[in-house]
Amino acid sequence: MLKLFLIRHGETEWNRIGRLQGHSDTNLSPEGLQQAQIFVKHLPFQHVDAIYSSDLSRAVETAKVIADKFNLPVKKMPILREMNYGIWEGRDIAELIEESPKEFGKFFTDPERCHPPRGETFLECQARLMIGIREIIADHDNQNVVVVSHGAAIRLIISAALDIPIHRLWAISQVNMAVNILRVENGDFTVELLNGTDHLRHL
C-alpha cells in the first residue's frame, strides 16, 4: 500500500489578489512561507520516503520546507505543474469575468468545455498530471510519498482518482497549504483526508 500526501503550495501574492498563475513562475508570499513552516510543525505523518514537486517556484519552495524536516531531496517534475491557462495567465479573475463572461465563465461553470486560448483544457491537464502520478506510484510501492502541486492540479488528480466528473471539479475544496491523503492499493484510490487544514489554525 502506498500513501500519497498531496499538498497544495502555500499562498502567493497572486493567490491573495485573485490573479491566475498557471505556468507563471511565482514565489511564496511571507504568509505562504509561514504556512509551510507551520505545516511541518503539525505534520499528519511521521515518516516520508520521497518528496516530489512541480518545478514551479511556489511549489518547490513549499516542498523544500518539508524536505528539510526529513533531510530529503526535492524531486522536481514539470509534469506536475499547474494547468496552463494560456493568455489568461497573469490576469485578475474578476477582470476576466467582466471582460469575457461567456468564455471565461466556463472556467467555473462548465470546465469540461473550457479551453483557455493557447492553454490546456482541464482534460488535457488531468491526463498529463496522471502520467506523473502513475510514475510515482510505480516507483514507490508500500511507501509514504509527498507530492506538492497546485490548486486546480490537485483537484484534477483527486477527481481522476475518485472518478469525479470534471464538471464537479470546483466542488473539491482546496485552500493554500491544504493536505490530502490518498491510499493507493492495487491501483485503487481511497481518500483518508481531503483539504486538511487543521495545521492552519496555529497561524
Where are these regions (language model features)?
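General small-molecule cofactor/ligand-binding pocket signal
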Residues: 5, 75-77, 192
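Phosphate-coordination/substrate-recognition cap region in phosphate-metabolizing enzymes
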Residues: 39-104
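Acidic, His/Gly-rich catalytic cores of divalent-metal-dependent hydrolytic chemistry
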Residues: 192-203
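Loop-to-helix element that buttresses phosphate recognition and phosphoryl-transfer chemistry
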Residues: 5-65, 116-130
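Active-site-adjacent alpha-helix immediately C-terminal to a catalytic or transition-state-stabilizing loop
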Residues: 60, 131-190
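Short, basic/glycine-rich phosphate-binding loops at helix/coil junctions
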Residues: 16-19, 102-116
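Active-site metal-binding loops of divalent metal-dependent hydrolases
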Residues: 10, 151, 197
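Short coil/turn segments at beta-strand junctions that form active-site/ligand-binding loops
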Residues: 2, 47-49, 141-145
